[in-house]
């Protein structure tokens, strides 16, 4: 397979995942902005700041920077080194771990997806300004996650070496 096709597949994997994060952050940012524009009490401002700091640490640093982003970058490198049609066409899904992954990773990805859907359904029922306060923290986490993903992808691509295991089973044909 041509080198440029493999490189494009790896780029599609990382950029596709980053695009989903950016899209979600922009969608949620409108709710956070609505809450701030409507005016917050001092207690609500305090909770907004505490939530943003907590989500930066929990979602951004621990979730994305230490786990998700390096793994997505490692799997994008795997797309480049071991391309298949499925991996190239569906590179963002492969890089996120939805297929061609260890049983543990697939289980964690699907459980994580279900929990995100549940959180979205629950957050939709929360009135303003509380929804905006919650969404502001998620936006901070997603922003951190996007930046950490781009940094991890660049470092992995530059070194041509994954920073963490790609968590691909030994006999993965997809």
PLM segments and residue spans:
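Juxtamembrane loop-transmembrane helix junctions in multi-pass integral membrane proteins
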Residues: 1-7, 35-42, 129
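Hydrophobic alpha-helical transmembrane segments of multi-pass integral membrane proteins
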Residues: 13-25, 49-57, 94, 106-122
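Juxtamembrane "helix-exit" motif on the non-cytosolic side of transmembrane helices
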Residues: 25-35, 60-65, 121-131
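Cytosolic-side membrane-entry/anchor segment at the start of a transmembrane helix
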Residues: 1-31, 142-173
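Hydrophobic alpha-helical membrane-embedded segments
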Residues: 36-74, 148
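Alpha-helical membrane-embedding segments
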Residues: 72-83, 101-118, 165-174
């Amino acid at each position: 397979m041509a080198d440029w096709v493999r490189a494009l597949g790896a780029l599609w994997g990382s950029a596709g995942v980053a695009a989903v994060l950016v899209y979600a952050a922009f969608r949620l940012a409108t709710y956070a902005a609505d809450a701030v524009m409507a005016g917050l009490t001092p207690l609500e401002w305090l909770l907004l700041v505490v939530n943003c700091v907590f989500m930066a640490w929990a979602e951004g640093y621990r979730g994305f920077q230490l786990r998700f982003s390096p793994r997505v970058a490692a799997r994008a490198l795997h797309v480049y080194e071991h391309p298949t049609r499925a991996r190239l066409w569906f590179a963002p899904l492969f890089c996120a771990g939805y297929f061609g992954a260890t049983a543990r990773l697939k289980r964690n990805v699907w459980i994580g997806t279900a929990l995100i859907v549940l959180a979205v359904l629950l957050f939709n029922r929360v009135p303003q300004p509380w929804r905006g306060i919650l969404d502001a923290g998620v936006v901070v986490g997603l922003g951190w996650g996007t930046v950490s993903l781009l940094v991890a992808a660049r470092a992995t691509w530059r070194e041509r070496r994954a920073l963490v295991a790609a968590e691909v089973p030994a006999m993965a044909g997809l």
